[in-house]
Amino acid sequence: MKGLLARMHQQWQNLFPSAPSKGQHFEQLAERWLQARGLQPVTRNYRCRGGEIDLIMRQGETLVFVEVRYRSQTSHGGAAASVTRCKQHKIVLAARHYFKQHAINEASQACRFDVIAFEGDQPDWIQNAF
């Protein structure tokens, strides 16, 4: 009976993945997609008290802080529109925390903030999004 319940639970999870696993899936897709375009991964899911950064990548000498968003429907403005000013502020605070924790001079390190927006399977890469 336990085996049957475990299999049913696994099938249920495959049909209806949780939001975190769906988010992780699209973060992995975004990371591979960016790597195919020449960016190098630095870290994934950087967290601090003020916020979180999904991906930190490097493109040449530039650190790229990437927010990954997925929306199955665009009825509420779509994936890119879901990166609100409040969310942008939290990402910037997390980036500043990253600089401090890694002894990086914020004034001399080139950086930018990108958004990878998924609506379906195709990513929309918005460079210098904010």
From Swiss-Prot:
Pfam families: UPF0102 (PF02021)
NCBIfam families: PRK12497.1-3 (NF009150), YraN family protein (TIGR00252)
Protein name: UPF0102 protein AHA_3896
Gene3D superfamilies the UniProt entry points to: 3.40.1350.10
Any one Gene Ontology molecular-function term assigned to this protein's record: nucleic acid binding
Lineage: Bacteria, Pseudomonadati, Pseudomonadota, Gammaproteobacteria, Aeromonadales
Family named by the database record: Belongs to the UPF0102 family.
